[in-house]
Design a protein with these regions (language model features):
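Glycine/threonine-rich beta-strand-loop-alpha-helix active-site module
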Residues: 4-98
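Carboxylate- and glycine-rich phosphate/diphosphate-binding segment that chelates Mg2+/Mn2+
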Residues: 72-163
Length: 163
């Protein structure tokens, strides 16, 4: 629906507002709109090359996995029950606004989900076998300590800018 509307309206920029899933959706719409007639699934399965996309901006309203800083994207083909990743610099936004004040009104449950998401994505990389890099591990450990401490603060007061 988003790609079709983007093509019909001649969209030349996508502004994704929300969390990582909103950003990923905007990214996919940008790829599809810039490549009319090409199946997104064919791009993800590498049957078609992705050589152009629309510019995408991100306004984050939740702290979580950091999708807006990654070159990775995912697409789910519900018809066949598959989910694939796609890594390309074309997945990066032209800007990302990450203002903690935009998260102040989140319910505690959602704040907790964001804390867990940050920790789990950090641990995924931390426990990759056969990739020994002490400095990267130390950064991950520091991030986990910070998220635990700041997470406790945010759970007590969601409008604490220092959290």
């Amino acid at each position: 629906m988003g790609v079709k509307k983007g093509i019909e309206e001649g969209v030349d920029f996508i502004l994704a507002v929300g969390g990582g899933k909103h950003y990923r959706c905007g990214e996919s719409i940008a790829h599809g709109t810039a490549n009319p007639g090409v199946s997104l699934w064919d791009i993800w399965t590498k049957k078609e090359s992705l050589t152009k996309t629309l510019k995408v901006g991100a306004v984050l309203t939740i702290s979580a996995a950091g999708s807006e800083t990654s070159d990775s994207a995912v697409l789910t083909n519900e018809a066949i029950g598959k989910k694939l990743g796609l890594g390309t610099e074309l997945n990066r936004p032209v800007f990302a606004i990450m203002n903690p004040e935009l998260t102040y009104t989140l319910p505690k449950y959602q704040i907790g989900c964001g804390i867990a998401d940050i920790m789990m994505h950090t641990l995924e990389r931390y426990f990759i076998p056969d990739q020994k890099n002490r400095m990267t591990d130390e950064i991950a450990e520091g991030l986990l300590r910070t998220v635990i401490d700041s997470g406790r603060m945010a759970m007590k007061r969601s409008d604490d800018y220092d959290a």
